[in-house]
Amino acid sequence: MEDERNTESHQGGEAAEQVEVKDRGLFDNLLGRKKDDQPEEKKHEEELVTGMEKVSVEEPKKEEHHAEGEKKESLLSKLHRSSSSSSSSSDEEEEVIDDNGEVVKRKKKKGLKEKIKEKLPGHKDHAGEHAPPPAATGFPAPAPPASVVTAAPTPAPAPVVTHGDHHHDTAVPVEKIEGDHAKTEATLPRAPEEEKKGFLDKIKEKLPGGHKKPEDATAVPPPAASPAAPATTPAPAHPPPATEEVSSPDGKEKKGILGKIMEKLPGYHKGSGEEDKTAAAATGEHKSSA
């Protein structure tokens, strides 16, 4: 029995070993296949990676080429624009190329003579015809300065003065307009204050009781008229009669004003004014009785 058991156990152990060996062989086969497949996959991956690297390397070269072309075009366009605008701004601006290769415009420094010429009204800027239009702003454009023309004043003719025996002619200026038409303006002589006083004295003399005493006349002589002033003959005054002045209701007021004026004049006494009042009252009574 023990021998059988030993043989069975020995057989069982061999079978297990075979199974294990087979299993190991299967794993080995699988692992071997995997190992064989790995180099192919690696080769394929390497090819893909190399292709991607080639593509990635080639693409930046194209972009750089395009960028260089654009830069060249921009420089050419700038040069073309500068050459086209150089005719308009050649007098005022200069084109200078910087270290970076960019074209920069700089304004020329104008001399004192050019500035003075620009300020003169007759100076015309030739570059203004080709200058670019000003930038559009909300404010209106300033109007050009209008030319100022000053007309020389016409000399006035000398006044003509003729001296007579008792009459002085005043100056009459004559102004010519447009060469054909003429206007004359005669200056009327103004009577001085002394002549006005003489006119009042004449009125007072015509009034009753307005005569001055001889002593007053000798004491205060009337001032002599200045020779330079033109002698004008006063118009003959027609004073109303004393009776009419008394009969009118406004006669008293008029007399009061005249009395005040007469009081202020030199050589006039109040007694003469009272005599005038008494005479006026007498004439009024005479009228009422009539």
From Swiss-Prot:
Gene Ontology terms: biological process: cold acclimation; response to abscisic acid; response to water deprivation
Record field: compositional bias (Low complexity): 226-235
Biased composition (Pro residues): 131-145
Tissue: Expressed in panicles.
Induction per the UniProt record: Induced by cold stress. Induced by drought stress, salt stress and abscisic acid (ABA).
Disulfide bridge positions per record: none
PANTHER family: DEHYDRIN ERD14 (PTHR33346:SF2), DEHYDRIN XERO 2-RELATED (PTHR33346)
Family: Belongs to the plant dehydrin family.
Protein name stated in the entry: Dehydrin DHN1
Natural source organism: Oryza sativa subsp. japonica (Rice)
